[in-house]
């Protein structure tokens, strides 16, 4: 349960970082640029013109989910402007319980 909560907190923090990126640059990073765009200035289009030289994460690294897997970032998203996903303990799409996906569009109970 604690790992699920940690993933939810991480996703909320990543969302905040993405929103700060958009406030500075007028757009979100593309799927191809990925979350790495929050710590390293992208060199592919669209190149951000007002990228924060300190990046958008306090620790200057993209967090992994509590199971050691990278968060999935899609922009444009299927469920919103962007989608953030942890595939849970099994690192596979779908599942139930601790294997359930944790996302930025569904509230976990």
Language model regions located:
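Amphipathic alpha-helical segments typified by the pilin-like N-terminal helix
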Residues: 1-9
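Acidic, glycine-rich loop-and-strand cores that form catalytic or ligand-binding grooves
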Residues: 34-55
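Short, flexible segments with low predicted structural confidence
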Residues: 9-10, 43
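Short, surface-exposed interaction loops/tails
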Residues: 4-5, 16-19, 24-25, 32, ...
């Amino acid at each position: 349960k604690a790992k699920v909560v940690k993933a939810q907190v991480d996703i909320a923090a990543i969302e905040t970082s993405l929103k700060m990126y958009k406030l500075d640059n007028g757009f979100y990073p593309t799927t191809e640029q990925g979350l790495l765009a929050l710590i390293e200035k992208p060199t592919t289009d669209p190149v951000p013109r007002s990228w924060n030289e300190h990046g958008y994460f306090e620790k200057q690294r993209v967090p992994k989910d509590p199971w050691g897997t990278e968060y999935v970032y899609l922009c444009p998203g299927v469920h919103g402007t962007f989608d953030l996903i942890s595939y849970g303990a099994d690192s596979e799409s779908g599942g139930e319980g601790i294997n359930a996906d944790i996302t930025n569009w569904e509230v976990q109970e």
